[in-house]
């Protein structure tokens, strides 16, 4: 059985994160179509099954058939986790919607005319209200709707994980490479918890944001989040280009450990440390055995830490890199563990929090 499958279904993303391993953005258009997704799931189910799948991107909420993908995973009895930045494309109003909106506004404020408001002033009021609605409608992105969140709950989604890197809006905009999206994200986080979903957050400590952790913990406590994962910055993809402005110095890392120790006592949920930051290899690495990643272009890799790693080096380590577009049936699931996490071997990680 495949224990852990991470499936990047799209490279398109509303953000332009400084550390993004997938080099995702709105100018990227590679996508896994629904039929290929189903065929891949069917293949793994035929050779032993899938215990857990993590659906990610890019931003998976920009995939037109995301909800169908989640439904298909749950039909097959797979524990399904969704990774997101909490942003989706805004559903624009049609001309009919706008006409209905204006009609409703006129009905709602008709008493103003009856109470003596001048006709011209009334028309100016309706115009202003319409313009306010249309200004909001002109936005490209939006938060998840209450309907979205309840649909995810009804589909049986097991967990949703938010990429949440800062509480200060300027810091958030800098590290996420976006503008005016912070409020969408926080609103989405509140909505998913209100819908009863299990919700976690991921935080990558960098020069830009490592001092933000206490404020993030406070917000997650208010939102009643279940878990916060502290992840190591991996210099791959866009992160490799920005390594000098992201990678913590030894002094900064030691300061972050002190911040982490305080936050560990304050967070109401579970505070988890990613494998590369664990001092002792308590987690037995299964990368390339019964743990796999499928990129947005169909390439199959052993672990998310290697999405931009040199393919020849991986092959030299005995790790095959097939592609679901061309040779899906060549993918084999093995069992076993590595003596040391593969990410620590290849990236020479030697810092630890625990």
Regions found by a protein language model. Name each.
Residues 4, 288-289:
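Short coil/loop residues immediately preceding or within conserved phosphate-binding loops
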Residues 1, 23, 299-300, 304-354:
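Flexible mid-to-C-terminal extensions adjoining Fe-S/redox cofactors in radical SAM and related proteins
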Residues 100, 104-136, 149-159, 163-287, ...:
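Radical SAM enzyme [4Fe-4S]-AdoMet core and its adjacent flexible, acidic
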Residues 5, 9, 160-162, 201, ...:
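A structural signal for short, well-ordered beta-strand segments
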Residues 1-151:
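Conserved alpha-helical substructure of the radical SAM core
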Residues 6, 10-13, 278, 296, ...:
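Residue-level signal for mature regions of secreted extracellular proteins and peptides
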């Amino acid at each position: 059985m495949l224990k852990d499958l991470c499936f990047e279904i799209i490279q398109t993303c509303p953000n332009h994160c400084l550390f993004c391993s997938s080099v995702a953005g709105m100018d990227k258009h590679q996508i896994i179509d629904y039929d290929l997704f189903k065929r891949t799931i069917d293949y793994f189910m035929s050779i032993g099954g899938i215990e857990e799948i993590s659906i990610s991107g890019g931003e998976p909420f920009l995939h037109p058939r995301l909800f169908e993908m989640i439904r298909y995973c749950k039909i097959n009895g797979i524990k399904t986790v969704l990774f997101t930045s909490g942003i989706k494309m805004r559903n624009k109003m049609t001309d009919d919607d706008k006409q209905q909106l204006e009609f409703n506004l006129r009905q709602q404020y008709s008493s103003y005319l009856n109470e003596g408001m001048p006709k011209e002033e009334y028309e100016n009021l309706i115009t202003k209200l319409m313009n306010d609605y249309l200004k909001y409608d002109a936005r490209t992105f939006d938060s998840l709707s209450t309907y979205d969140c309840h649909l995810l709950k009804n589909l049986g989604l097991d967990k949703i994980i938010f990429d949440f890197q800062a509480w200060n809006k300027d810091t958030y905009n800098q590290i996420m490479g976006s503008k005016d999206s912070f409020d969408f994200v926080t609103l989405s986080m509140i909505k998913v918890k209100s819908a009863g979903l299990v919700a976690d957050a991921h935080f990558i400590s960098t020069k830009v944001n490592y001092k933000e952790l206490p404020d993030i913990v406070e917000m997650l406590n208010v939102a009643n989040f279940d878990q916060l994962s502290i992840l190591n910055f991996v210099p791959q993809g866009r992160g490799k280009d920005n390594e000098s402005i992201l990678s913590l110095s030894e002094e900064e890392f030691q300061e972050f450990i002190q911040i982490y120790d305080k936050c560990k006592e304050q967070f109401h949920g579970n505070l988890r440390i990613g494998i590369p930051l664990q001092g002792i290899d308590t987690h037995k690495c299964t990368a390339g055995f019964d743990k796999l990643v499928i990129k947005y272009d169909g390439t199959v890799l052993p672990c998310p830490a290697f999405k931009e790693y040199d393919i020849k080096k991986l092959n030299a380590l005995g790790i095959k890199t097939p592609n679901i577009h061309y040779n899906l049936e060549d993918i084999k699931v093995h069992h076993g563990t590595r003596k040391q996490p593969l990410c620590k071997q290849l990236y020479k990680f030697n810092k630890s929090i625990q």
